[in-house]
Amino acid sequence: MLFIAAAAFFAGCAPEQVPLDSPYVYIEDSEGNSKMDVGAAANDYAVTLYVHTSSRLMDRDVKVSYKAVAGNGLTEGRDFRIKQGTSAELTFAPGIYRMPIHIVWYKAQAFDPAADNTLTFEITECSESDFTIGLLSLGDSHLKTSYTFTRTK
């Protein structure tokens, strides 16, 4: 009986496995999507995207940069606006893992279905070189590196 108790005790003392801890940064909406259609009639339609980091608690700020690229069918200020206070560089203080990007869509004054009516937010850089941009998944190594809005009729 003593042998069984000792074996159980020492089995619990096996060397710990190192957990998978690959830090990453990604972008999505509140539903977890990486794309959305916005109707041309949408007016004052507010959308919030979120840039997330996933890592152990950092002892310093993590800076994440993104760019917003509008297709030739969209014009900032006329079709949409990235709300004031949303910077193209987000600073994640220690303990902060999610930062918002606020966008407001306006009713399309002139909608050309043949034009490129997309607005894409793409994560471009992270101050921490060991962070992966995007989620890692089998078969597709960088999910959610960008978020695309498509203006539809």
Regions found by a protein language model. Give the residues of each.
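Sec-dependent bacterial lipoprotein signal peptides
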Residues: 1-13
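Short boundary segments that mark the start of a structured unit
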Residues: 13-153
